[in-house]
Amino acid sequence: SGQALLIAGDSGVGKSTLLDVLAGELAPLQGRLRLNGRDFADFLPSDEVGYLAQQVDIFDLTLAENLRLGKAGADDDALWQVLEKVRLADWARAQPQGLQTRLGEYGAAVSGGQARRIALARLLLKPRALLLLDEPFAGLDAATREAVSAMLLQERAQGLLIVVSHQPPAQADFQVLRLQEKA
């Protein structure tokens, strides 16, 4: 608990595939995954595991409705708190409709970095023992990347965080697993 792992490596070495297996999206071709002596499949599917895929889903709904897909009963205060965490609260407050801002088909009304942070906020609304994040910093400027990274490390104080990123944060609080192609 409280562990943060950064999976690094060149394109095509299997970082995202590894996360897909851990998230239960793909079955391993061989071998078994175990966590604390139990088959990893025993943990899936579960509300204890949150997965941010490389391709995020933003729906033609309001910001609030998109966020509440992560926790249906979340009140507006919880939504504003999670938007603060992912550095989107100022943007949302600047919108004429605030939380009721429509995001458009496939999130057309927001940038790629904003879409990733909305999807991340959706995951963070519900406490989870394991967060699997594929490229959570994509499309973010350096300052936002560092702020989101620091927040994730703080949030994971009681859980496990596994991140795949081509733009790793400057902080050294991640253990690093570097994947390489077979020679």
What are these regions (language model features)?
Residues 8-10:
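The feature captures the beta-strand-to-loop junction immediately N-terminal to the Walker
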Residues 23:
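Helix-to-loop junction immediately C-terminal to a conserved catalytic motif
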Residues 31-45:
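Conserved ABC transporter NBD signature motif
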Residues 56-74, 138, 170-171:
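Conserved catalytic motifs of ABC-family nucleotide-binding domains
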Residues 64-104, 150:
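ABC ATPase nucleotide-binding domain helical subdomain, centered on the C-loop/LSGGQ "ABC signature"
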Residues 118-126:
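Hydrophobic/aromatic position at a conserved helix-loop-beta junction
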Residues 125-129, 158:
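A short, proline-enriched helix->beta-strand linker immediately N-terminal to the Walker B motif
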Residues 131-135:
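Catalytic Walker B motif of ABC-type/P-loop ATPase nucleotide-binding domains
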